[in-house]
């Protein structure tokens, strides 16, 4: 109530703001985050911002996700990325792969890059808290689905650890082994799933395999702050039929293959990360994002000789996203 509606450029802002909830105070001027102690002082509930030269925004309850200001890049060092033009003189103009987009204010499009304070420390780390908007949650367009930039092991970023979907050749149990590597609610305490009990369905949206094995009524994600991406969500990214079994069906969504062998080297093994979705026609297969081929594929769920990891997906209310 004591915040002035206008202030003359060059003046100082000096107001009392009581923080009873122990939120992190964040002050922005002209949409740039100011540094406490340098750009402003906040001592004993008194906020002082000197030399005002633009619009001021003050947050106690910060958005969980805010737009990235710098995009992640990787250098193409293998035939897969080279083959689609990431090389000097190639179709992409250089050997540098840029992941995602900075987007347009007020709009959300697949691949828009965000930094999300998932651990609740008040810091938006562009290196380890990078996410990409995929789509709105099915049946709830107030919630955004965002995918992490990296695979994880025990909830922390890891490029070179791989896990089975399930430990034996039976996909009808669900991805219980892969799920166990997702960030827990203690690790990513600032985000939560809209539903922690999820219905497991195959690529056709049905609840059993072609040979009659029923999937569990619910997958219990109650210990986890994130989940796996689904085949249904991938299908919504393109107007073409998926799976097409053709390389490059996801070339318009390369943010899905950041930090995989797509950019790094030649590799004859399947690589990428698991989707939540079991395959209907093969009850020992689960679907994956096949990263080097930029498409979906299916792999035996129990295999340990494939480079298939776990990549978290978070669900965030659009009210908690600055876009």
PLM region spans:
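Conserved N-terminal submotifs of small, disulfide-stabilized extracellular modules
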Residues: 1-9, 63-66
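Short, exposed beta-strand/loop patches in secreted or surface proteins that constitute
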Residues: 5-6, 38-42, 105-106, 133-136
């Amino acid at each position: 109530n004591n915040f002035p509606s206008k202030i003359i450029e060059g003046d100082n802002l000096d107001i009392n703001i009581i923080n009873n909830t122990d939120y992190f105070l964040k002050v922005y001027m002209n949409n740039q985050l100011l540094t406490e102690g340098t750009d402003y002082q906040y001592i004993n509930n008194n906020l002082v911002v000197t030399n005002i030269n633009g619009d001021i925004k003050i947050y106690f309850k910060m958005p969980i996700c805010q737009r990235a200001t710098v995009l992640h890049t990787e250098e193409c060092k293998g035939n897969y990325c080279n083959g689609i033009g990431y090389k000097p003189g190639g179709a992409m103009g250089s050997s540098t792969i840029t992941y995602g987009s900075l987007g347009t204010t007020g709009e959300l499009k697949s691949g828009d890059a965000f930094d999300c304070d998932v651990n609740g420390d008040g810091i938006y780390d562009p290196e380890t808290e990078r996410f990409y908007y995929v789509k709105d949650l099915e049946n709830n367009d107030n919630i955004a689905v965002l995918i992490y930039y990296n695979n994880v092991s025990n909830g922390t970023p890891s490029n070179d650890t791989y896990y089975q979907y399930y430990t034996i050749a039976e996909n009808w149990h669900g991805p219980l082994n892969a799920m166990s590597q997702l960030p827990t609610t203690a690790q990513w305490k600032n985000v939560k799933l809209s539903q922690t009990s999820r219905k497991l369905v195959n690529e056709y949206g049905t609840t059993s395999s072609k040979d009659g094995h029923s999937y569990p009524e619910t997958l219990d994600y109650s210990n986890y702050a994130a989940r796996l991406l689904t085949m249904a969500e991938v299908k919504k990214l393109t107007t073409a039929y998926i799976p097409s079994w053709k390389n490059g069906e996801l070339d318009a969504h390369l943010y899905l293959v950041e930090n995989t062998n797509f950019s790094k080297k030649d590799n004859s093994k399947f690589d990428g990360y698991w989707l939540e979705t079991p395959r209907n026609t093969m009850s020992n297969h689960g679907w994956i994002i096949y990263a080097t081929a930029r498409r979906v594929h299916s792999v035996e769920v129990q295999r340990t000789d494939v480079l298939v990891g776990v990549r978290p997906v978070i669900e965030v209310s659009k009210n908690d996203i600055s876009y």
